[in-house]
């Protein structure tokens, strides 16, 4: 559709997943042939495969599940910010100049990631102080183009914990490589999976002023 930018990776067999998590898998239930008029496939995947929203339940045993979240958080004005850098954690000062007049949804381009099939070992994440200061500025949703807002090896998940305290929504594994920094409308609705800790999204951006 005119004006839409797809920022979701294709879900496919062989794509990178968090170490130890379930692989994306597909099986064929029915195949078109002399005795069958249709193709029907089934698939299995982790709730954190591809572009997805983390529910508070993911990092808080008493947190809300994905079906309980307000959908309004995932639709509305958003700003894409180039937050690439050499340090393993993105500091607030690196993006501060891009925040003037920013809407409550921020999408951060943290690394050059062209191949979504390959797991991005050592990916750049967010310093918890960065998340804290963004939340205090009124940011309600943070999206990143890496698998997690915390480093791959983190066990304490400090940036997730800041999001928990401030009730900030998290969208991970977006495709932002070719998106020009600036302001857009974000549409990233998570699937309504009752009682689960996360859900995949088909996230898109709409250029402001487009129909």
Model-derived features: positions:
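Active-/binding-site microenvironments in catalytic and ligand-binding cores
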Residues: 1-211
């Amino acid at each position: 559709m005119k004006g839409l930018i797809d920022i979701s990776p294709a879900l496919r067999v062989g794509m990178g997943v968090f170490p130890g998590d379930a692989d994306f898998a597909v099986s064929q239930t029915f195949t078109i042939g002399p005795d069958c008029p249709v193709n029907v496939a089934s698939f299995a995947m982790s709730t954190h495969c591809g572009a997805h929203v983390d529910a508070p339940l993911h990092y808080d045993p008493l947190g809300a599940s994905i079906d309980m979240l307000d959908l309004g958080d995932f639709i509305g004005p958003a700003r894409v910010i180039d937050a690439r850098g050499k340090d393993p954690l993105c500091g607030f000062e690196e993006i501060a100049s891009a925040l003037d007049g920013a809407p409550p949804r921020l999408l951060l381009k943290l690394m050059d990631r062209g191949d979504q099939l390959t797991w991005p070992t050592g990916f750049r994440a967010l310093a918890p102080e960065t998340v804290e200061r963004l939340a205090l500025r009124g940011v309600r949703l943070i999206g990143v183009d890496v698998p997690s807002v915390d480093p791959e090896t983190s066990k304490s998940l400090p940036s997730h914990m800041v999001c928990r305290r401030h009730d900030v929504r998290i969208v991970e594994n977006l495709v932002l490589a070719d998106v020009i920094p600036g302001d857009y409308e974000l549409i990233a609705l998570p699937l309504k999976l009752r009682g689960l800790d996360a859900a995949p999204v088909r996230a898109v951006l709409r250029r402001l002023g487009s129909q």
